[in-house]
């Protein structure tokens, strides 16, 4: 029986406990999840792509079922190249749905053989975003409970603490 593979794309700048929640729960459904870090030159990232990948790998540890990769170009092309058939997207609130719905419909118009699975973030992380974490951290606010210790350490280094 072929492996059920899903791709979980995002900028992960930085990865949060909300992202990890989606990965953990996604692994209950899929044999393998590829965490695909988008290389987006238009986005002003705090962490360069290689640092984001290293942080995600450190946080995921020795997971044989979660792989970290990077991609450019059309997501559906990348998903197909990986032998996956599903894109996982996390939703925090209704406000996320409209944008994600548009992306899913666009992907569907490009190819019929890749599905998008929306997963609601668990309640403790329903407000959490990488942007909020970066803002709170930049103002020297508490981010324990929002990101893993390795990410907090990396943020502290970025903000000279």
From Swiss-Prot:
Localization per record: Cytoplasm
Disulfide bonds: none
Coiled coil feature spans: none
Pathway(s) this gene product operates in, as recorded in its UniProt entry: Cofactor biosynthesis; coenzyme A biosynthesis; CoA from (R)-pantothenate: step 4/5
Main location: cytoplasm
Keywords, in A-Z order: ATP-binding, Coenzyme A biosynthesis, Cytoplasm, Magnesium, Nucleotide-binding, Nucleotidyltransferase, Transferase
Site feature (Transition state stabilizer) residues: 19
TM spans (from-to): none
A Pfam family recorded for this sequence: CTP_transf_like
Residues the record lists as binding ATP: 11-12, 19, 90-92, 100, 125-131
BP GO annotations: coenzyme A biosynthetic process
GO MF assignments: ATP binding; pantetheine-phosphate adenylyltransferase activity
Residues the record lists as binding substrate: 11, 43, 75, 89
Cellular component per GO, a single term: cytoplasm
EC annotation from Swiss-Prot or TrEMBL: 2.7.7.3
Cofactor(s) annotated in UniProt: Mg(2+)
Catalytic reactions of this protein: (R)-4'-phosphopantetheine + ATP + H(+) = 3'-dephospho-CoA + diphosphate
Purpose of the protein: Reversibly transfers an adenylyl group from ATP to 4'-phosphopantetheine, yielding dephospho-CoA (dPCoA) and pyrophosphate.
Protein family (similarity comment): Belongs to the bacterial CoaD family.
Record text on subunit structure and interactions: Homohexamer.
Protein name per UniProt: Phosphopantetheine adenylyltransferase
Native source organism of the sequence: Geotalea daltonii (strain DSM 22248 / JCM 15807 / FRC-32)
């Amino acid at each position: 029986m072929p492996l059920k593979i899903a791709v979980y794309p995002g900028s992960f700048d930085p990865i949060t406990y909300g992202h990890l929640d989606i990965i953990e729960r996604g692994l209950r459904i899929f044999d393998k999840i590829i965490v695909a870090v988008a290389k987006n030159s238009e986005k002003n990232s705090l962490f360069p792509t290689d640092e984001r990948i290293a942080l995600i790998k450190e946080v995921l540890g020795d997971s044989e079922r979660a792989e970290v990769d990077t991609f450019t170009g059309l997501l559906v092309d990348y998903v197909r190249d990986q032998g996956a058939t599903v894109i996982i997207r996390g939703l925090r609130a209704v406000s996320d749905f409209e944008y994600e719905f548009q992306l899913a419909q666009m992907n569907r118009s490009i190819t019929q053989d890749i599905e998008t699975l929306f997963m609601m973030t668990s309640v403790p992380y329903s407000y959490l975003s990488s942007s909020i974490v970066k803002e709170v951290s930049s103002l020297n606010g508490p981010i324990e409970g929002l990101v893993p210790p390795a990410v907090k350490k990396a943020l502290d280094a970025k903000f000279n603490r």
